[in-house]
Amino acid sequence: MHIHAFSPLEVWQGAATLGLPVEDFLRRLKAVGLDTLPGTAAEILDDEVRAIICPDKVDTAQWLEVIETAHRVGFTTTATIMFGHVDTPRHWARHLIRIRDLQRRTGGFTEFVPLPFVHMEAPMGVRGQSRHGPTFREVRLMHAVARLALHPHIRSIQTSWVKLGPEGVKACLEGGANDLGGTLMNESISRAAGTQHGQEMPPAAMEALIRSIDRTPRQRSTAYGGVSEDIHARGMTAAELTPMVLTPPRKRRREADTNQERFEYAE
């Protein structure tokens, strides 16, 4: 089993709670079995934006410090960007440059994952303090520009079916992305923010989606190594998960209630 856990925010807070330097805390995690770290909580690596959207999280320098230290200790990590809220293309460029410069020093990023902001149930979106996410054109450009800006230092640009749905990821795979986000089992974060693309995409569905745009799928490990034919076959024949009963996001519940009221009134 591969353990992929602890964002830079969680590492920073964990080290502070125990009164340890970040490096010592990371070495403890490595000693007890942690394999890789997610490069989440990055949002936008620019403190102009972070002061607005996540003032209670780590700042840009702290995020970069945790990731660089993790790479030095021997971990590989992902890198993300969450865009389309109060940010601008200038902030996106700064973010990409900071990721690229760190990768040049450490080589520890395995992939870059653009994550379009989902506004429907996000606090900023509910309060009307942000955009309603990026445009689809901006989403496609982010994947394409990331490919150009980060090449050859980060070779895998991942697109998220949870955020974009099947048609969205097809478009991104044809314009910059070369990696499709994981199968997952019980995705909850994006759903809580308002997405409705489901909680799981089985391997067979992922391969069919990739083949539909005349690409050849290749399963990989979390660390971007190869996967044996036996493991691949077991994944393709695994039983479906038990269907989950999902509570619709608040906005969808309000819309359903309103539609029901209109229907009853019409009768």
Model-predicted regions and their roles:
Residues 37-40, 70, 99, 146, ...:
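Conserved, mostly hydrophobic/aromatic
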Residues 103-267:
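Auxiliary Fe-S-binding modules of radical SAM enzymes
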Residues 7-12, 41-44, 81-87, 116-120, ...:
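Active-site-proximal loop/turn and secondary-structure-junction residues that shape catalytic pockets
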Residues 1-67, 71-78, 85, 107, ...:
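Conserved SAM/AdoMet-binding glycine-rich loop
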Residues 17-24, 54-62, 87-94, 130-138, ...:
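Alpha-helix N-cap and loop-to-helix initiation/capping positions
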Residues 70-114:
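Aromatic-anchored, glycine/proline-accented short structural segments
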Residues 38, 78-80, 179-183:
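Short hydrophobic alpha-helical runs that function as membrane-insertion/retention elements
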Residues 20-26, 86-100, 163-175:
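Catalytic cores of alpha/beta
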